[in-house]
């Protein structure tokens, strides 16, 4: 009962917020960032918030955890200052900001938050100031003084030339006829403004930044007697066109316009939703080689993939980007959208030339470079962007590169450049065949490969797939990087050249003079049939040198005992195919003899039972061969090791028994006696 009461007390404590109130709904991202800023500023007194200012600019941000430690925003260094949190002010002689700001009407509150220019323009109209000072409940997104001063002169002149129509309408568009706080500003919502019920777009991002028509909230939730004031960094204007309509009227989108029409994506860009279009200008298309561009424009599927790669699934305003973030496109790819100073970047490159062109269904950023996805590229183009350029050069020398630029459904198993660090192989008929065996006759995806699968190549070979815990291999070569899936082909980056099998394990051993003594031993033991038939074996093949290193009397004794010879040879044969790329730190491989082999790899050196392997991955149709310069001994043939194991087992038994009785504890003291008896058994 006492335990139950403690649990109930804990549950009640967790469900109750500050001052005994029930815990409320989850805080919005903005409120969470503000809370973090409060925590960082509390050492300076009550209601103090830490603020990060970007050095060399007037930009300030409430600090989140990541920015606090990095001290950077958009790659620029920041300095920390401490200010009164929204709604509070200092009191002379007291620490922090202990006093709540006295409530005034909307008009007066705009002056408090630093929007005196908005006050000035409000005074110029006949109707607006009385509304702001009178009864009612309103929200105003008040532009900062800097926002007004940054307006183009012709825009400002048109507003002030007709204050009771143009200026009044512009100011009313910044107002909503009810109180709206940041916790109500949901991502992707629209608010109805007081100018002809025109919509205002709201975006509330996970990093705590809130935008209104892509203008950032600088100071939020300043209460007034008749509403609330949010200070924003831009003067906002009405949005009338959708994305497709903007494409239609912009001269710089002539090529994009034609491409969208040909792809049928115009229905998407004029429909409902909130998208970001990274809109390539005419100049962006002109940078692409004519052959490549014509190929894509003439291929409906590639064209659609190209355009989908320029459409983000959500609206992303420039002011919301303070660091790199991955964003998904309509095509399912991801782009890294970031910033460097005042410039927006895509995949680390500053390609955005004009930003935040607002549409009713999203936002447009002009880009001066085409973002071609892998799915619209040929295999040759994919390879040109990967660390396999040497393999491509070899293909070109062999006259085989046309396979990678056409419409053949292929998967190219391309060795890394590092594979050729010792030189490029000579191009002859045999090398051409080997290169063709690096081209699989279908477009694959590595995530669908499975162990035991066979792949047909242009060179006429069947390649086997081996799946291990931490690697995926095709014959002796393992995939070293993520697939690149192109329009018709897929690029697999491989860690070595393939060596397709040329015969059975027995064929391999017979064809290599190093193994002549092993072949004779296999024949003597009657194991030829096993190594000639279909199967999956890993053979650690002792070389002639290994047999010659044995004491003559021991070797003669072994060869004279057919049963013992068979036992030892079977211990050298694993019951599955294990290529070196699948080994990892340690693999215990069961042998045909029954005991397990310990195979390990460290610093590119493969060992079996701690003995280094002389040569790895000699592929056969029914297995793989490793050359070793030692004859391995099964555990039963290692008396010292066997005795140690028995001794360890005896000690363990007595240790376990000691946990249960005093008699068992006395038995543990007898363990050294048993140890000595076992030592005698070994001799």
Curated annotation (Swiss-Prot):
Record note on modification: Gamma-carboxylation is controversial. Gamma-carboxyglutamated; gamma-carboxyglutamate residues are formed by vitamin K dependent carboxylation; this may be required for calcium binding. According to a more recent report, does not contain vitamin K-dependent gamma-carboxyglutamate residues.
Superkingdom assignment: Eukaryota
Chain ranges of the EMI domain: 45-99
Role noted for this protein: Plays a role in cell adhesion. May play a role in cell-collagen interactions.
GO BP of this protein: angiogenesis; cell adhesion; chondrocyte differentiation; extracellular matrix organization
Gene: Tgfbi
Domain FAS1: residue ranges: 103-236, 240-371, 375-498, 502-632
Gene3D superfamilies: FAS1 domain
Pfam families reported for this sequence: Fasciclin
Modified residues annotated as Phosphoserine in this record: 37
Protein localization: Secreted; Secreted, Extracellular space, Extracellular matrix
Protein name: Transforming growth factor-beta-induced protein ig-h3
Subunit relationships: Binds to type I, II, and IV collagens.
Record organism: Mus musculus
Residues with S-cysteinyl cysteine modification: 65
């Amino acid at each position: 009962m006492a335990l139950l009461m403690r649990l109930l007390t804990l549950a009640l404590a967790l469900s109750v917020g500050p001052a005994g109130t029930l815990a409320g709904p989850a805080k919005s991202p903005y409120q969470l960032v503000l809370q973090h800023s409060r925590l960082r500023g509390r050492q300076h007194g009550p209601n103090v918030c830490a603020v990060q200012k970007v050095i060399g600019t007037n930009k300030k941000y409430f600090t989140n955890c990541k920015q606090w430690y990095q001290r950077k925003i958009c790659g620029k260094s920041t300095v920390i200052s401490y200010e009164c949190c929204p709604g509070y002010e200092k009191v002379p002689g007291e620490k922090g900001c202990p006093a709540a700001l006295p409530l005034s009407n909307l008009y007066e509150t705009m002056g408090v938050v630093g929007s005196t220019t908005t006050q000035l323009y409000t005074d110029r109209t006949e109707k607006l100031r009385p509304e702001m000072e009178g009864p009612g409940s309103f929200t105003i997104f008040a532009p900062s003084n800097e926002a007004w001063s940054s307006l183009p002169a012709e825009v400002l002149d048109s507003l002030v030339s007709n204050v009771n129509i143009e200026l009044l309408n512009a100011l009313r568009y910044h107002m909503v006829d009810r109180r709206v706080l940041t916790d109500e500003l949901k991502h992707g919502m629209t608010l109805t403004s007081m100018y002809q019920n025109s919509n205002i777009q709201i975006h509330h991002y996970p990093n705590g930044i809130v935008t209104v028509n892509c203008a950032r909230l600088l100071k939020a939730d300043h209460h007034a007697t008749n509403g609330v004031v949010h200070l924003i960094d831009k003067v906002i204007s009405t949005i009338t066109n959708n994305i497709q309509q903007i494409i239609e009227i912009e001269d710089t989108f002539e090529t994009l316009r034609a491409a969208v029409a040909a792809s049928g994506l115009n229905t998407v860009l004029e429909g409902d939703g909130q998208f970001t279009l990274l809109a390539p200008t005419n100049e962006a298309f002109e940078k692409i080689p004519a052959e490549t561009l014509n190929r894509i424009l003439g291929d409906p599927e590639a064209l659609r993939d190209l355009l989908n790669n320029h459409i983000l699934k959500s609206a992303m305003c420039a002011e919301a980007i303070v660091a790199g973030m991955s964003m998904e496109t309509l095509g399912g790819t991801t782009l890294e959208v970031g910033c460097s100073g005042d410039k927006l970047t895509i995949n680390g490159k500053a390609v955005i030339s004009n930003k935040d062109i607002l549409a009713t269904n999203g936002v447009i950023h002009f880009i001066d470079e085409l973002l071609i996805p892998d799915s619209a590229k040929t295999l040759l183009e994919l390879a040109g962007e990967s660390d396999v350029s040497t393999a491509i050069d070899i293909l070109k020398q062999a006259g085989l590169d046309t396979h990678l630029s056409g419409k053949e459904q292929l998967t190219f198993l391309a060795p890394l450049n590092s594979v050729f660090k010792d030189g490029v192989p000579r191009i002859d008929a045999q090398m051409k065949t080997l290169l063709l065996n690096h081209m699989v006759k279908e477009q694959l995806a590595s995530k669908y490969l499975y162990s035991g699968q066979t792949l047909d190549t242009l060179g006429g070979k069947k390649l086997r797939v081996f799946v291990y815990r931490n690697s995926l291999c095709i014959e002796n070569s393992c995939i070293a990087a993520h697939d690149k899936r192109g329009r018709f082909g897929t690029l697999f980056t491989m860690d070595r050249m393939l060596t397709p099998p040329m015969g059975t394990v027995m064929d391999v051993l017979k064809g290599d003079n190093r193994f002549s003594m092993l072949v004779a031993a296999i024949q003597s033991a009657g194991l030829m049939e096993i190594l000639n038939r279909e199967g999956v074996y890993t053979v650690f093949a002792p070389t002639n040198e290994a047999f010659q290193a044995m004491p003559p009397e021991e070797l003669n004794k072994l060869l004279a005992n057919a049963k013992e010879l068979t036992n030892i040879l079977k211990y050298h044969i694993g019951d599955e195919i294990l290529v070196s790329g699948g080994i990892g730190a340690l693999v215990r491989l069961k042998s045909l003899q029954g005991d397990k082999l310990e195979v390990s790899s460290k610093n590119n050196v493969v060992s079996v039972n701690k003995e280094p392997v002389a040569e790895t991955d000699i592929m056969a149709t029914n297995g793989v061969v490793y050359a070793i310069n030692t004859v391995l001994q099964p555990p039963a043939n290692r008396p010292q090791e066997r005795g140690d194991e028995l001794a360890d087992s005896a000690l363990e038994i007595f240790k376990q028994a000691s946990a249960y009785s005093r008699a068992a504890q006395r038995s543990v003291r007898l363990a050294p006696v048993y140890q000595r008896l076992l030592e005698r058994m070994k001799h």
